[in-house]
Amino acid sequence: MIEAYSLFSGSSGNASLVRSGDTAILIDAGRSRRAIACALGSLGVELPAVSAVFITHEHTDHIGALAQIAKHEGISVHASCGTADALARLDFVGNTLMRHPVIYKESVGNLTVESFPLPHDSACHVGYVVRDEEGDGICIATDMGHICEALLSAMTGCRGALIEANHDIDMLKTGPYPAYLKSRILSPVGHLSNGDCAKVAQYACHLGIRHLALGHLSEENNTPRLAYDTVCAAIPSDVRLTVCDRCAPTRIM
C-alpha cells in the first residue's frame, strides 16, 4: 500500500514523502536538510534511505535543501530539462541530477513517478503522480495559476491528491501585499485560490479520489479553516479532507 505525507507546505518550504514497502521518495526539498531529516525521522524514515527527489520547479521554497541533500546523501535528483537548466543557473551542481522531458515516467524501486505540466511562473513546472506496483496512486499538484486539463487528466485512477489552496481572493485583494504581487498571484501563472481548489476537488471526487489534502496555503491571505470550509462544501462527506501543516508532517493517505 502506498503512503503519502506532506512534510511541510507553504511559502517557507515544501516537501512531501511518498513510500511503499522499502521504497521512499521525496517530492521537492524546501526548507533545510535538517528540517527534512527531522520530519522524516518523526515518520520512521532516515534521510539516507530516500531513493530519489523529484523537483516540481526551481523556486526556493521547493529546493532550499536540495543541494545539501544531493551533496551529503548522494540521492538522485529528477527534474524537467527546463527546471534542471534553472537549477544550474542557481549554482546547483551535482552529478546526481537527472534531466527529463516535461512529461516523463521514472521507476524507483516499487514506485512509478509520472510528471505532467502545470501553469506557473517558473522555467518548466510540473506536478507528479506516484503509483505503487498495484496501481494505487497519489497526485501532487501545487503552484498553479489556473485549473488545467493536464491536472484533471492526471488525477484519473488516483486514490489521493494534494492540491493547492493558496489564497482566499477577498483576503488577497484587501490584504497588505503590494499591487504587483497581488497581480502575480492572481495571474494565470500564479497560485490557485480556495474557490478554484474546490472545483478541482469536486472533479477529483467524481474520479474516485477518497483522500484530499490542501497545501501551499498563504499565511497572509488564507486560513486553514477558510480553505477547509470552502472545499468541504464542494465534496461528498465521506471523502477524507485535511489541511497540510506549514511546519510539521501531515498524512495525506
Question: What residue ranges belong to the model's regions?
Answer:
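Active-site environment of divalent metal-dependent phosphoester hydrolases
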Residues: 59-63, 84-86, 122-123, 146-149, ...
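Conserved beta-strand hairpin/beta-sheet module of binuclear metal-dependent hydrolase folds
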Residues: 1-43, 126-143, 160
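Metallo-beta-lactamase
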Residues: 81-135
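Metal-dependent catalytic neighborhoods of phosphoester/phosphodiester hydrolases
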Residues: 64-73, 89-90, 222-229
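Structured catalytic core of nucleotide-sugar glycosyltransferases
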Residues: 5-15, 56-66, 84, 88, ...
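Active-site neighborhood of phospho(di)ester-bond hydrolases with catalytic His/Asp-centered motifs
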Residues: 27-30, 51-58, 78-81, 139-142, ...
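Active-site metal-binding motif and surrounding structural segment of the metallo-beta-lactamase
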Residues: 33-79
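Cap/insert and terminal regions of metallo-dependent hydrolase folds
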Residues: 149-245
